[in-house]
Amino acid sequence: MDIPDDPCDRLIYANHNITVYVYSILGERCAPKSAAIPSVAMYSLLLLLGVFGNLCTIVVIIKNKSMHTLTNFYLMSLATSDVLMLLLGLPMELYDAINVVYPYPFSENICKLRAFLTEFTSYASVLTICCFSIERWLAICFPLKSKIFTSFSRAGVIIFCVWMISFCAALPMAFLVVLNRVPLPDFAIDQPWSYLVSDDGMTIRGTDLCGMDFFKQMEQKIIIYFAFIVFFLLPAVFITSAYCHILMRLKNMDSCFGKSGRLVQVTDKQERTRRSVLKVLVAVVISFFVCWFPFHLQRLLSINMNESNSSPAMHNVFISLFYLSGFCYYSNSASNPILYNIFSGRYRSAFCHTILGEKITAKYYASASYGERAANQRGAGPKVPLIQRAKTERNFGSNNLPPVKSSSLQGVAYSASKKDKRRKSSLIEFNVQFQVVQDE
């Protein structure tokens, strides 16, 4: 085998038919520049932003006692798995984008370790998102019952189980991934020149490729379908259902307060907080689907598509999907700090104090407070007594509250009957729900 001067040129073997055969199976040794340059740019950006954002999340949560909450405990675990996924996966992706695809330059152990760690950290991220969603679902929809199931000690056990389950689930991938070599074709077996193209008389020299074992197609399908169902389909169904339930509870919260007999006047700040929570919940579902669906679709196509019978157009679609899925796969980890933390005023304040420093933070909040006060003063109208508004308006301004009878302003007397106890319990529950939304 002759090594070409340009590393991206085809490998030249002693037999021309072998040269053509290898190229027909493995294709070009380097990614085309039209794909390599955008890949390097996007992967570099994701690596810098993702690692910085997730490390900031970890530092902010650790250094600020006000951030030591159950939700942030899950967020720190998620940030840890995302940092590991970015650090362990993206450098190798960058190397593959600017170097030859084959022969693989590293040992088989490194090949296995790379596949295992990438799969392991991605599983941990998905399961942590599920745990975080369960915690939010319980806290908002079942606030009284959530006190039984949510505690720091139990959260620690849950997070430990998440990492152990992810570790065990990723082990089969480590055993299935090997250094593959293109097997010798029938016309090259037991030929006088076979030793010139093969080291072992069975495979072609210089065709080492890190990937799942070519000869274990059934095992490939089992692992890929398992990952798709357990770590994408089921979490997607659960997350969507949980957040739809949360959205329904938040939208019905005002009417439930009104039916309970208690008058609640929602301020503009509380209304903005609720809208922010709704945006976060919708963004979580959309991000999960958008970032993970192309990756799993590409893997499913890779085990079901017969390249020998596929059209050139289908092949181009698959190649484009390969690059798109890689970008989406890692962008989920890079965007998690934004999706889970940027809408939280408490996190922004802690981030500014921890990362930017006290002086910059003081200037920022001083200007922000002045702008908010000016806006409030401009929007302030004549004061209308609350009782008069209750008599003359169907709703309380833009708060979309249900009509409130003037008699409800006198308070609600609860008797000892079972019916009144249930009403009182319901009122307490919705008070807790409303407080949860305000604290986000």
Predicted regions and their residues:
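Intrinsically disordered regulatory tails of 7TM GPCRs
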Residues: 1-27, 182-204, 255-278, 311, ...
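Loop architecture of class A 7-transmembrane GPCRs
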Residues: 19-29, 97-120, 148, 153-156, ...
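Extracellular TM2-ECL1-early TM3 structural module of rhodopsin-like
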Residues: 32-44, 67-134, 138-152
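Hydrophobic residues within alpha-helical transmembrane segments
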Residues: 41, 45-48, 77-80, 91, ...
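Helix-to-loop junction signature of class
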Residues: 43-46, 84-101, 115-118, 122-129, ...
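Cytoplasm-facing ends of alpha-helical transmembrane segments in multi-pass membrane proteins
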Residues: 51-62, 87-91, 120-144, 158-160, ...
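Intracellular signaling interfaces of 7-transmembrane GPCRs
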Residues: 63-73, 136-158, 240-280, 303-315, ...
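Intracellular effector-coupling site of seven-transmembrane GPCRs
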Residues: 192-220, 228-231, 248-295
